[in-house]
Amino acid sequence: MNLLNKKPVFLNDWSDKEGVANDFLTNLDNVNILFASYTYQDYNGDAFVLFEQDGKLFEVNGGHCSCYGLEGQWEPEETTIQALTYRLTEGHMGQDSWCGNQYGNELKEFIK
């Protein structure tokens, strides 16, 4: 199934696109968010966003301590399903035990 045909997934502290835009302090009008997870726990925050724009797939990763938030960290990097799959299966993507931002299993299911 094409990712664009799936219902967007918002996990943990995010429930919609507006929450993502507010936390990053950025305009997301031309962004099609596909999958987003953010957790703020023990004075630290960790975020991951997968989105489509102009037919290309991008991801944004952000993190912060208690002093700041995600503002100024909206720095999209182009990605592929293959790259995400590799990082999910061979690395530790989506398995953050410090901030509790656990989204690896959900992202694996979403992109397959």
Placement of each model-derived feature along the sequence:
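Compositionally biased, low-complexity repeat tracts
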Residues: 15, 40-43, 58-59, 65-68, ...
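Intrinsically disordered, low-complexity regulatory segments enriched in Ser/Thr/Pro
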Residues: 54-83
